[in-house]
Amino acid sequence: MELSEIRAELENMASRLADFRGSLDLESKEARIAELDEQMADPEFWNDQQKAQTVINEANGLKDYVNSYKKLNESHEELQMTHDLLKEEPDTDLQLELEKELKSLTKEFNEFELQLLLSEPYDKNNAILELHPGAGGTESQDWGSMLLRMYTRWGERRGFKVETLDYLPGDEAGIKSVTLLIKGHNAYGYLKAEKGVHRLVRISPFDSSGRRHTSFVSCEVMPEFNDEIDIDIRTEDIKVDTYRASGAGGQHVNTTDSAVRITHLPTNVVVTCQTERSQIKNRERAMKMLKAKLYQRRIEEQQAELDEIRGEQKEIGWGSQIRSYVFHPYSMVKDHRTNTEMGNVQAVMDGDIDTFIDAYLRSKLS
């Protein structure tokens, strides 16, 4: 490795450190740590043990990020000093040692970057993913089933557990809607990159004239919650209906009214669950889904208020396509947010979507 190449690597690291600092909002995190330390020094701190543990966990998490950043910064400065020394006094052994340390530090940078990419609230949670085909009948419904397979394969590749919470089959082929629970560490952190409208362009196998069709499927992604959030759902605000399960399942399908539909009357948000044999378990799961949807709604309303204050206008509905999957007249998958492209459409449909997820998360970091 030439000294000029080492210098280029160190300059790249300096640029990444600046991005890390901005993403971390270092000054505000240090101020928050000082706040929490002050709380922990209070003689009455342990009177409420649950609250105390929450404060300790937050402080430890913030300190981990800040200390990791400072350690990377110090290591980078040390390597920069070694590089400057080598410019003045070349030394083969010292340069080899510098190359070795540079490689090790690059690995630490990448690991820290991944921590930052998945450091938002609830990134670590399981994910609830919903697919809703747009207008277009069988063609759109078939596109929905293709995306269902894609996300299922992606989850399996990562060692995640994929469960079907609700499934409404299409009239001839595909799906009218599906809700998945994807269980695994950081499942929501990754899959939040998939929220939006997915567009398919292909020669439709359902069109005897062999014409090219464009289809759309909306993908909604929410974190699964246990008791992390305070969403108050009053009994009088919900309407619960039961019905017979209609999707693929066990022998219980269409034999008992085990499926549950819950409507939140103030917002008209509807959730359904039919994956369990027990109506009680389906209701428990449906309530978790409702909690997630109401949380998502709250966050989106807050974001809309911020956008209005900033004067930002965002496309909504079927115009807000995040990705196009073109099978004809050429093969290409393109993410419109990051301009990331892949020519191997079949690999993408087999679950190879990490390139798009990674590019999106990194774009949010910078």
From Swiss-Prot:
Pfam families: PCRF (PF03462), RF-1 (PF00472)
Post-translational modification comment from the UniProt entry: Methylated by PrmC. Methylation increases the termination efficiency of RF2.
Protein's UniProt keywords contain Cytoplasm: yes
Family matches, as PROSITE patterns: RF_PROK_I
UniProt GO molecular function: translation release factor activity, codon specific
Top-rank lineage group of the source organism: Bacteria
Keywords, comma-separated and alphabetical: Cytoplasm, Methylation, Protein biosynthesis
N5-methylglutamine modification, residue list: 251
InterPro entries associated with the record: PCRF, Pep_chain_release_fac_I, Pep_chain_release_fac_I_sf, PrfB
The keyword DNA-binding is annotated on this UniProt entry: no
GO terms of biological process kind: viral translational frameshifting
GO cellular component, one term: cytoplasm
HAMAP family (alphabetical): Rel_fac_2 (MF_00094)
Family that this chain belongs to: Belongs to the prokaryotic/mitochondrial release factor family.
Additional free-text comment from the UniProt record: The gene for this protein contains a UGA in-frame termination codon after Leu-24; a naturally occurring frameshift enables complete translation of RF-2. This provides a mechanism for the protein to regulate its own production.
Record function comment: Peptide chain release factor 2 directs the termination of translation in response to the peptide chain termination codons UGA and UAA.
Protein name: Peptide chain release factor 2
